[in-house]
Amino acid sequence: MKVRASVKKICRNCKVIRRNGSVRVICSEPRHKQRQG
């Protein structure tokens, strides 16, 4: 899980979603998981 000021899609499997007021990236590649904060 990377914590970043700006979350971006890295590959075509990445999806940007809002969960409990935080922006997250979920992906089939575990290294692409990000959250904003």
Curated annotation (Swiss-Prot):
GO terms classed as biological process: translation
The keyword S-adenosyl-L-methionine belongs to this UniProt entry's keyword annotation: no
GO MF entries: structural constituent of ribosome
Keywords noted in UniProt: Ribonucleoprotein, Ribosomal protein
Gene Ontology CC: one annotated term: cytoplasm
InterPro entries in the record: Ribosomal_bL36, Ribosomal_bL36_sp
Domain of life: Bacteria
Keyword Ribonucleoprotein: yes
Transmembrane intervals: none
Pfam families xrefs: Ribosomal_L36 (PF00444)
Family, per entry: Belongs to the bacterial ribosomal protein bL36 family.
Protein name: Large ribosomal subunit protein bL36
